[in-house]
Amino acid sequence: MYPDCDEILKMAPDYDIIPVCREIYADVITPITLLRKLAAVSKRYYLLESVEGGEKWGRYSFLGFDPVMRVKCSCGKVTIEKDGEETEKVTDKPLEVLREILKDYKAPRLAGLPPFAGGFVGYFAYAMIGYAEPKLKIKKGTFNDYDMMLFDKVIAYDHLKQKISIIVNMKTDKVMENYGKATAQIQDLANLIRSQQTADIPVSKSKIDFTCNVSKEEYCKLVEKTKEYIVDGDIFQAVISRQFSSRMREV
């Protein structure tokens, strides 16, 4: 377990939270196995995978569950879900809401920890560019502009060392009490990982039919027209795309 309590006591005055970590061997456990274990104890969980160079798996897989907070934005209305309550605010700078929240979660970067030890996990939709460039008048989609969840517990699967890092971020207001809670949570997670407890992850078996907003012929014409603009010196670069969409029937 690291850092130990003495080290945390020294760091506590400078930080709001401190990550506490324990490593265990992965053995025959895989990231998908871990995800199924988290699905057995929580309705909100995630798995982040990474690929390097488009061909090789990244070193780490990251998993988490039971977020302490959810923050979502739609058309400038930000909704914050925390401790079973919702608060709303209207803003033209929704990213600032996330930045303000993170100010209360200042944490040290500890040597030996994986590159991600806790924080927001979610997505930013294409429509977010509309807040930075309002003249573009981006059409609102069916998704939230962003949907983020704040996780204070992280399981990092190290494919290189075949080890699993169990990380719990503890608050520094009551060091001794919170350190005890963090170590207990880590032990509970270690027990869950080693247990046989799993759950099936819902998978849609429906046939998916996609529709496109631009035909292939129209798209080819756009490409040729763009080439002409570049040759004429009107532009030097353009990104032309086709939007494919499908309605979800089941999950």
Say what each PLM segment does.
Residues 1-251:
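Extended alpha-helical targeting/anchoring segments
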